């Protein structure tokens, strides 16, 4: 089946050209391309069109679960008749196993698995192994973490067909081998029940039952059934039943693994004893021996993933299987916000290894535990045959990989332009800033001011307050929740000016802000680098009157790059607007986005054409898991979101904190709706 793009929107601006260039590059086998798209230019819609054109299975990689949920919702809307799947970490809570030698503290692994996300992960792998091409998997960095061998998973797929002869008991044993459990009383996901000649299977990757009826040893009927009402949804002539777990193995593989583990245990114990680590040798022997007894008796043990290399039959040091192994050879990877996502992929292996080294050196785990890991960055690169990097400010890595193939998308469907940038002398900069602030206050617009130090932010705030300017400051010393509230108060008009040091991060969306003032813009450093200045200037791009003032005594290379690039984009945007008779439209963003919002529409009053505008922030209802949560699960998720909000604010990631805050409000509303009182 081919991809079928369903949308009321038409490509506008430079979207058609971007779509054509990216499509041509993929079809010609170009290994890496970069889509440099400004905020609000409809990058997601462009990628959806490319996917429809190339008709290849596609992995969309996002750097966090919240944004992945938003992308999942958008692509689900674009491709309602195709397989759009969601693959993120299935842990509601996860405390990894660790050992701290300095305090002789061993931290045992603790976790809580979200059943709904587990279902969605299985649905993703099942869709990929079904052989269909029209599959989009939206994933977090979880896609590079170890999982079961796809060959073992596929070998346990049960293919059935009406009229085929198969002994019912043989069929039931095959279900058990695929890790389905018989439960004739309560039928839950991953279970099956038997009533006479009827076998009901609650598929592990679906919300429906599969009912298989026998006539003797012949399959008489196959149909999907609603698990609550029992009403038939659809009959089938043939069906593939995919396993109930991603980690499949056989009895033979288990026995072989136990033998190899015990051999390696003997060697490692002898090694510890040879270097005088008697206590570590004893600890390792006891722990591994206990694990082997558990595997022999029950088929599993706590921390069995640390023995995954033996079950997979891999050699020491080889990479684990991961989601990328479930894709066919010819597939596309799209890395969203690549300037953040790529460094995250690069960092995963190092963080995992640093934790496990202590576990191995102090006798808690065999050295094979080091092979239960995420992919190294080089391994990921070797598997990523075709990549599109998507970012407003791509890093040097993406540009080098793309070898100059950078597709620009700088025209916004709203007609909004990049802000005007002015450079003014730092002499009397505060007095000049005061005048500019008063102009904005009269227009009921907002101002952002960025300083170099916390002390400067506080002193400037005090000065402005003494001059009757409603303002506040944000930095790491301000209480976590208070920071998020201040951001919201700025939008609501409680404050007219917000002062900060590093508050102007990627994705900070404040349409009311028409002026961004950068003090000491000529002081080179990470806060005044080309990318930082570009991101900072972009905070004024959501307002029709957007303007940036850089206060400096000289123009640095970073300033020059930012100014030249912004002016180049403005010229292109202005020319397009004039050619097509478009008047820039101010974005009107509600304080809290609609729970069911899937994007915004803008009406070009001159042309009457509809254009797709990217949603300005993720919404929690986009996450397919939340609607199915029990009250206890929702309460736990709310507590986790609250902690994430606090952590994000602590790290000065205010846009993330605001997104988590919005999630929390939505979950509170959902709680009141489902369980009033």
Curated annotation (Swiss-Prot):
Span of domain Helicase C-terminal: 429-591
Record: residues binding ATP: 37-44
GO molecular function: ATP binding; ATP hydrolysis activity; DNA binding; excinuclease ABC activity
GO cellular component term, pick one: excinuclease repair complex
Assigned keywords, A-Z: ATP-binding, Cytoplasm, DNA damage, DNA excision, DNA repair, Excision nuclease, Nucleotide-binding, SOS response
Principal location class: cytoplasm
Helicase ATP-binding domain location: 24-412
UniProt domain UVR: residue ranges: 635-670
Short sequence motif named Beta-hairpin, residue ranges: 90-113
Domain characteristics, as noted in the entry: The beta-hairpin motif is involved in DNA binding.
Summary of subunit composition and partner proteins: Forms a heterotetramer with UvrA during the search for lesions. Interacts with UvrC in an incision complex.
Family, as annotated: Belongs to the UvrB family.
Record protein name field: UvrABC system protein B
């Amino acid at each position: 089946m081919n991809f079928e793009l369903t949308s009321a929107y038409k490509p506008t601006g430079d979207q058609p050209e971007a779509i054509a260039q990216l499509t041509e590059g993929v079809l010609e086998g170009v290994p890496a391309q970069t889509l440099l798209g400004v905020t609000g230019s409809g990058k997601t819609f462009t990628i959806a069109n490319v996917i429809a054109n190339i008709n290849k299975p596609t992995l969309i990689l996002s750097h966090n679960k919240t944004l992945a949920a938003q992308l999942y919702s958008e692509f689900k809307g674009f491709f309602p008749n195709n397989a759009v799947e969601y693959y993120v970490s299935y842990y509601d809570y996860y405390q990894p196993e660790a050992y701290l030698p300095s305090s002789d503290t061993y931290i045992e692994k603790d976790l809580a698995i979200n059943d709904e996300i587990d279902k969605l992960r299985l649905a993703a792998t099942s869709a990929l192994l079904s052989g269909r091409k029209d599959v989009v998997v939206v994933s977090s960095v979880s896609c590079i973490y170890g999982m079961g061998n796809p060959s073992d998973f596929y070998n346990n797929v049960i293919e059935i067909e009406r009229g085929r002869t198969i002994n019912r008991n043989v069929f039931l044993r095959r279900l058990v081998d695929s890790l389905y459990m018989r439960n004739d009383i309560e039928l839950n996901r991953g279970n099956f029940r038997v009533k006479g000649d009827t076998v009901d299977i609650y598929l592990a990757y679906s919300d429906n039952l599969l009912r298989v009826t026998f006539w003797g040893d012949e399959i008489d009927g196959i149909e999907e059934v609603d698990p609550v009402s029992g009403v038939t949804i659809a009959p089938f002539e043939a069906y593939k039943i995919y396993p109930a777990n991603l980690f499949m193995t056989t009895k033979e593989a288990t026995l072989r693994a136990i033998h190899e583990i015990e051999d390696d245990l003997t060697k490692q114990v002898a090694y510890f004893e040879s270097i005088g680590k008697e206590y570590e040798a004893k600890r390792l022997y006891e722990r591994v021996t206990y694990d082997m007894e558990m595997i022999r008796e029950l088929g599993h043990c706590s921390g069995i993933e640390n023995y995954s290399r033996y079950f997979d039959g891999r050699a020491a040091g080889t990479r684990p299987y991961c989601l990328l192994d479930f894709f066919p050879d010819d597939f596309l990877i799209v890395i969203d916000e690549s300037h953040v996502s790529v460094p995250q992929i690069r960092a995963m292996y190092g963080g995992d290894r640093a934790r496990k080294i202590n576990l191995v050196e102090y006798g808690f785990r065999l050295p094979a535990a080091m092979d239960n890991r995420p992919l190294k960055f080089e391994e990921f690169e070797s598997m990523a045959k075709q990549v599109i990097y998507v970012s407003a400010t791509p890093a040097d890595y993406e540009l080098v990989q793309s070898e100059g193939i950078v597709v620009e998308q700088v025209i916004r469907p709203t007609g909004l332009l990049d802000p005007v940038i002015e450079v003014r002398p730092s002499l009397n900069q505060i007095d000049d800033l005061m005048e500019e602030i008063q102009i904005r206050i009269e227009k009921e617009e907002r101002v952002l001011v960025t300083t170099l130090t916390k002390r400067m932010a506080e002193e400037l705030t005090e000065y402005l307050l003494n001059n009757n300017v409603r303002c506040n400051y944000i930095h790491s010393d301000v209480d976590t929740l208070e920071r998020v509230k201040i951001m919201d108060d700025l939008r609501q008009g409680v404050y007219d000016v917000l002062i900060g040091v590093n508050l102007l991060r990627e994705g900070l969306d404040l349409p009311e802000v028409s002026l961004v003032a950068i003090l000491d813009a000529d002081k080179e450093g990470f806060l005044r680098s080309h990318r930082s200045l570009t991101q900072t200037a972009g905070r004024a791009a959501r307002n029709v009157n957007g303007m940036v003032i850089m206060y400096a005594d000289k123009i640095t290379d970073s300033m020059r790059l930012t100014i030249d690039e912004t002016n180049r984009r403005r010229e292109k945007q202005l020319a397009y607007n004039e050619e097509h008779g478009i008047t820039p439209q101010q974005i009107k963003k509600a304080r809290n986005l609609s729970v069911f919002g899937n994007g915004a529409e803008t009406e070009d009053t001159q042309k009457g054409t509809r254009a797709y505008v990217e949603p300005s922030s993720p919404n929690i209802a986009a996450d397919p898991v939340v609607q199915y949560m029990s009250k206890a699960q929702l309460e736990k998720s709310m507590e986790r979101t609250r902690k994430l909000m606090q952590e994000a604010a602590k790290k000065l990631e205010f846009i993330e904190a605001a997104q988590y805050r919005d999630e929390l409000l939505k979950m509170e509303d959902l709680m009141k709706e489902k369980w009033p009182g």
